């Protein structure tokens, strides 16, 4: 599948709730958990959610993951097997025939366990990223989601059987797989990493409800934050764009033939825009865009002046065709807009969201402006995962508190003795209230997403005495 199509497909998936209660109004996703009081394990880090160094071996996990599919092709690709797996992922835990599924996937998923504990992830795709650009095919990335779905079934079976050590081994495999996705030099890799983590969180929540489940507060606390880094993907986007427009010459005048080839290539790149366009919109071909501007000497002169301001020699620009000047200026504008978003990536989520809201959207007539909003959506997805993990830390903190207070819930979060993370989208404590025997934990949606159920996560936690 083309990189651009994969990106939109993955982003669309994040509009769906994750193990929420569908009987409530669609304004929020309610996740109801009935849990037991449970003190922290001794030693505190007995349970972790990523493989420890002592479990690791030298090697490239990516090759290991892909080998899973060659071990059992029918298991992954057979239509009946896929349909059964879809059902097993959503079947109520008590209806799961766990005994039959405890070695689900057999050698293929045991191979995934091995791969997740190799120490040097390398997707070996950088050269193709430079040459193929937006046409880059990403079948390996999509297959990782299939692998995660299969691991989820085994995870659920282990939870249903009360085999917590085995279940946490599978959780480690899934969390490691998601982290390895962030080593992929595309934002799609990071998005799939977020998606895989959310796939793992469903069975993890089910495990918390099982009698005797160990408390995972410190396991969740010791996860890297952010769990899925976007650094490699953001760098890859810069490489990709530079490769796509390498024929846009800024050092010498371009011939008519060179310009025509470049314009045709730009139209190919902009095909991604048509995915979101509504029928009936006017022609937005690059040629049409240029023809509307090259006759206006004022526009061309202004473009040339902006290029001079960023360091291009004016005497050289005066020898360039008007189309070349306009395209160079449009690329300059795109890079400025792109970096206004990219520079926010490693800020705390609430700061990034606040500053992103102040960014002026690209002008409707901008040739490449459509590429920038996707960056904001990817950062938003990363923040939502951060919020979900932080909420789970709160759930486990409630279990810690209840274990020390005869099964009672705290009236306020300030009564909890362990550190609690702030809501990533506000930089403030999560919303919390107690209604009888039920604690309500709510995350605040990012600005503009107040009516989206997938952005309004509400945990209802009942402590079982």
What are these regions (language model features)?
Residues 5-15:
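Bacterial N-terminal signal peptides
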Residues 1-2:
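N-terminal secretory signal peptides that target proteins for export/translocation
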Residues 8, 18-465:
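Short acidic linear motifs
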């Amino acid at each position: 599948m083309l990189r651009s199509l994969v990106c939109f497909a993955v982003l669309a998936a994040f509009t769906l709730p994750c193990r929420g209660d569908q009987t409530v109004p669609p304004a929020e996703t309610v996740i109801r958990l009935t849990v037991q009081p449970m003190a922290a394990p001794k030693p505190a880090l007995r349970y972790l959610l990523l493989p420890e160094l002592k479990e690791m071996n030298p090697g490239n996990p990516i090759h290991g993951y892909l080998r899973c599919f060659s071990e059992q092709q029918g298991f992954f690709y057979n239509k009946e097997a896929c349909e059964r797996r879809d059902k097993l992922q959503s079947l109520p835990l008590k209806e799961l025939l766990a005994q039959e599924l405890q070695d689900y996937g057999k050698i293929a998923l045991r191979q995934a366990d091995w791969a997740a504990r190799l120490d040097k992830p390398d997707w070996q795709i950088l050269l193709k990223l430079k040459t193929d650009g937006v046409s880059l095919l990403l079948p390996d990335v999509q297959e990782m989601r299939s692998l995660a779905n299969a691991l989820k079934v085994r995870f659920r079976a282990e939870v249903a059987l009360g085999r917590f050590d085995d279940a946490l081994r599978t959780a480690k495999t899934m969390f490691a797989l998601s982290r390895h996705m962030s080593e992929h030099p595309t934002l799609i890799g990071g998005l799939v990493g977020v998606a895989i983590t959310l796939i793992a969180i469903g069975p993890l929540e089910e495990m918390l409800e099982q009698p005797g489940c160990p408390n995972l507060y410190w396991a969740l606390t010791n996860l890297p934050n952010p769990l899925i880094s976007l650094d490699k993907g953001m760098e890859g986007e810069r490489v990709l764009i530079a490769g796509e427009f390498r024929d846009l010459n800024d050092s010498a005048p371009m011939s008519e033939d060179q310009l025509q080839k470049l314009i045709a290539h730009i139209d190919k790149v902009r095909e991604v825009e048509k995915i979101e366009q509504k029928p009936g919109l006017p022609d937005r071909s690059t040629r049409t865009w240029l023809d509307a501007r090259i006759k206006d000497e004022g526009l061309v002169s202004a473009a040339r002046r902006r290029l001079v301001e960023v360091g291009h020699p004016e005497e050289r620009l005066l020898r360039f065709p008007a189309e070349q000047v306009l395209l160079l200026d449009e690329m300059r504008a795109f890079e400025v807009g792109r970096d206004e978003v990219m520079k926010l990536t490693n800020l705390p989520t609430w700061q990034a969201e606040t500053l992103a809201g102040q960014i002026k959207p690209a002008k409707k007539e901008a040739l490449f402006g459509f590429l920038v909003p996707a960056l904001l959506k990817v950062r938003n997805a990363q923040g939502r995962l951060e919020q979900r993990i932080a909420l789970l830390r709160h759930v486990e903190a409630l279990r810690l508190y209840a274990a020390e207070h005869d099964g009672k819930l705290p009236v306020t979060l300030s009564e909890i003795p362990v550190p609690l993370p702030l809501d990533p989208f506000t930089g403030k404590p999560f919303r919390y209230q107690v209604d009888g025997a039920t604690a309500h934990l709510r995350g605040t949606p990012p600005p503009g997403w107040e009516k989206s159920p997938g952005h309004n996560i509400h945990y209802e936690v009942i402590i079982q005495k």
